Design a protein with these regions (language model features):
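Aromatic-rich carbohydrate-recognition surfaces in CAZymes
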Residues: 112-140, 144-247, 461-476
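Bacterial Sec-dependent N-terminal signal peptides
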Residues: 1-24
Length: 487
């Protein structure tokens, strides 16, 4: 994707990232005394933008940063947490009012557009703090309202502009509108807003977001999911782009590979924004099931719309039954595993991609039980050389994907390994690897080379930064401070 001109926060992020290598060199020496520990901690200076340049500040988030930093004795880990956890708020959140209601537009980072997936994931770890901070709660309400608004502009789009300003992809051969940044159909784009709205409601008790705009969004989600089951033909969506990247366009005149209409939902593109090979993307279909059940609960409890709730539940049950029948492949080494993609004709794509939803991340999203034996087999498969996009080198190991290509590991995959781990030593390895592959910047990156972390993509990628903060916060709250302090 082409990147727009960097703004003030972008320049601050890039400058800070490059200026911290001296800090890293000063602070990597092993400390053996309290004095050395204090000196080492002092060497790590915050890489956050100056207070006046931060786009949004939250008292609850700042208090949480202070609390976690006080508990962590590893100065580099504390420094990285301080840099990463608030990165979405510091650099990507644009809060305002629209027609008397909160409205929040969230950049993905160095690309000044709002992805439904990224924005829903970027603000996710702040939801647990919303009850402590009315301003944070209002900002989150604005994200949810903006997501519903985006869905109602076009439920097939993955990324949106802040207004009808057009953009790089207006020449794509699809039903583009100036409000759209990109129109790649991805199931998870409609799931992340449901996940976020549901959790916000559960944490705050605020049901005001479930108004007519919400009901319209639900109708659009249901219609889109059903159209993409393709029971009545290929449906209204197609996509073509003039490009050198094969996975940035769809074959068969923009319709993608054929599918057998067995009840699963087509996802023309993956969460990486790469085209699917077989269009029933399994992790995203699992995500649709859990998201539809959440929507049904809201529609029943808040809107008193049993008709829509029943429609959500029936669709979820249909997709779930089809997953049980078509998603499992009997691997000669790992036994029954979940395929990454299928087509309903018997073809299976055996791989995983780092972007979430992924096969590895399914328990993180609440889509499968972590002790599901098929998931555990799948987890072993994806973290092995049997997965064509698993890379191992001198700097680390992990999952990447065709979006960046050979030998490039996504930190997101290492984070998901930690999120889905039940082994403290494995978690410890994950955190240490993440700390060792930041290239001295104090931030996460989109991907890094398996043999050289200094070779990385995207110095400003808010989702991965905030996700790292979410992981550390989760581990602290689960009583694993001692594990973190052993690093």
């Amino acid at each position: 994707m082409k990147k727009k001109t960097l703004g003030l926060c972008a320049l601050a992020m890039l400058s800070l990232a490059h200026n911290t290598r001296a800090n890293e060199m000063t602070a990597v020496r092993d400390n053996t005394t309290v004095t050395n520990h204090a000196l080492k901690a002092a060497a790590y200076k915050s890489n956050r933008p100056a207070l006046k340049n931060r786009l949004f500040t939250s008292k609850a988030v700042e208090a949480e940063i202070a609390r976690i930093k006080q508990l962590l004795t590893n100065p580099k880990l504390a420094w990285m947490f301080e840099n990463c956890f608030p990165n979405t708020l510091d650099t990507t959140v644009h809060f305002r009012m629209l027609n008397g209601k909160p409205d929040t537009f969230v950049y993905t980072g160095d690309i000044h557009a709002m992805w439904l997936r990224d924005s829903g994931a970027q603000v996710w770890p702040y939801v647990q703090l919303a009850h402590k901070d009315p301003e944070l709660k209002e900002m989150l309400e604005g994200v949810i309202r903006r997501q519903f608004l985006c869905i109602n502009i076009d439920p097939y789009a993955n990324a949106y502009n802040d207004g009808p300003v057009g953009g790089n992809w207006m020449s794509d051969k699809t039903d583009m509108k100036p409000e759209l940044h990109e129109r790649k159909w991805e199931i998870d784009s409609l799931c992340y807003p449901l996940r976020l709205a549901y959790q916000y409601w559960k944490e705050t008790g605020d049901a005001s977001i479930f108004d007519n705009e919400w009901l319209k969004a639900i109708a659009n989600i249901l219609q889109t999911f059903k159209e993409q089951q393709r029971k009545d033909g290929t449906g209204p969506y197609s996509f073509q782009r003039k490009t050198e990247r094969a996975l940035d366009t769809l074959n068969n005149d923009g319709l993608g590979a054929p599918v057998n209409p067995v009840g699963l939902i087509v996802s023309s593109f993956r969460p990486s924004d790469d085209a699917t090979t077989f269009q029933f993307l399994i992790p995203s279909n699992f995500f649709a099931v859990s998201s539809l059940h959440k929507a049904a609960e809201i529609l029943t409890a808040v809107n008193h719309r049993p008709d829509l709730a029943d429609e959500c539940t029936a669709l979820a049950n249909e997709v779930e039954a089809a997953l049980k029948k078509y998603a499992v492949y009997n691997h000669p080494e790992f036994g029954p595993i979940y395929a990454f993609e299928v087509d309903g004709f018997g073809n299976h794509m055996l791989m995983d991609d780092a972007n979430v939803p992924s096969l590895l991340a399914m328990p993180y999203l609440g889509d499968v039980d972590i002790n599901d034996p098929i998931y555990q087999n799948t987890r072993r498969f994806v973290w092995s050389t049997s997965n064509p996009y698993f890379f191992r080198g001198t700097a680390g190991e992990g999952i990447g994907g065709p979006h960046i290509g050979y030998d490039m590991i996504w930190p997101m995959s290492i984070m998901m390994k930690a999120f889905t781990s039940q082994d403290d030593e494995e978690i410890k390895w994950c955190i240490k690897t993440l700390m060792d592959t930041d290239a001295g910047t104090g931030f996460m990156h989109e991907s890094f080379h398996k043999d050289n972390p200094a070779k990385f993509t995207r110095p400003w990628f808010a989702w991965q930064n905030t996700l790292f903060g979410e992981l550390i916060l989760k581990l602290v709250n689960e009583g694993k401070v001692e594990l973190l302090n052993s690093l």
